[in-house]
Amino acid sequence: MKIKLFLITLMVTTGLFAQRTPETIQSKKLGNRTFTVVTPASYESSPEKKYPTLLVLDGEYLLDPFEGILKYGAYWDDLPEMIIIAVNQNYGETRFADSEFDEAGFPSGSGANFFEFIGQELYPYVDKKYRTLPFRIIAGHDTTAGFLNFYLYKDNPVFNAYISLAPEMAPEMEKRVAERLTKITKPLFYYQATGEGDLKEINEKAAELDANIKVIPNATFKYQNDAFKGASHYSLVAKAVPNAIYFVFDGYQPISMVEFQDKILKLDAGYTDYLIAKYDELEKRFGFKIKPRLSDFKAIEAAILKNKAYNELMPLSDFANKHYPKTTLGTYHEALYFEKTGNYKKAIKSYQKAFTQEAVREITKDFMMNRAEALKGKPDEPTEDAPAETPTNQPTEKTE
């Protein structure tokens, strides 16, 4: 009996955690190469969902810090779930061979082979086997951080975001990276970090690259440089990884109390447009669709009620029906519009439509029927000047 209970518990809990899968690929350029693929917690339970990817060089020791912050951020819906590809390089002289470059500062020998392996063999293998999205991040440390910059030398870079931690740069890289960034037109993110206690040569070249990037006029890319006081070559990684990931996904987070108070409530109009624009911009920036959060609908509803902009409840209803069809969400906003503008008969009919719809959080069928019942017998009083209502449910930091 205890064994059966253990097996049942194991099957139930297995789907709650990310899964690590060791992989081996027979490369035409490099022979056998091993790597680890980490799929997110929802991978098995959401078979239609696709995920952006993070390629971690020096995977033996960089995987854990990146996986940790991504799992934490995904729990709070601050960060998207991702597939992580961690390449093993820390045996013998492999990481140095993989990053080999010539006197001119370009990949050569085994470095050129590794460069092509990632784009021509590794990613095609991963894309075929796993449900991936085109948005790709690459991260590395010292030697491999310098190596990842080579992908910016291509006219159509393989990656959308670059995380360079204490980079050891090839000749002229501090100039070439900045030059390449001026010519790339697609959305791109570049993050660099150094530690005060690191080697002088690493910090000087990184500072020169930072200076070159900062003078680029009309930059079309996102850039952040962190120089950590008191950090060593190794301790800077723990400081930089959260900063880097949150830099790349800045704006992805749900509407916070600060955003609600300082931006949304201060609008004269266009509350629903604000919500629509937020998710349109996220899709444009990251190249994948993000389903609008229920907490964000609640935030916009609260702003509409606070500012008596009741006409905006109808476009909010349309937006809800688009993303949550056949649920009570859009119907609730429609009914609330009629109620707030004194059209009680229409409000009752709208509330009653929820009887055949799927409930969304607290907007249950009973909740909607009770709202309808409370309006029965009230004569219509159509008006656009209904009294203001102070919302009791403002957005919170915790979302489901």
Segments predicted by a language model, with ranges:
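Absolute protein N-terminus
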Residues: 1, 18-19
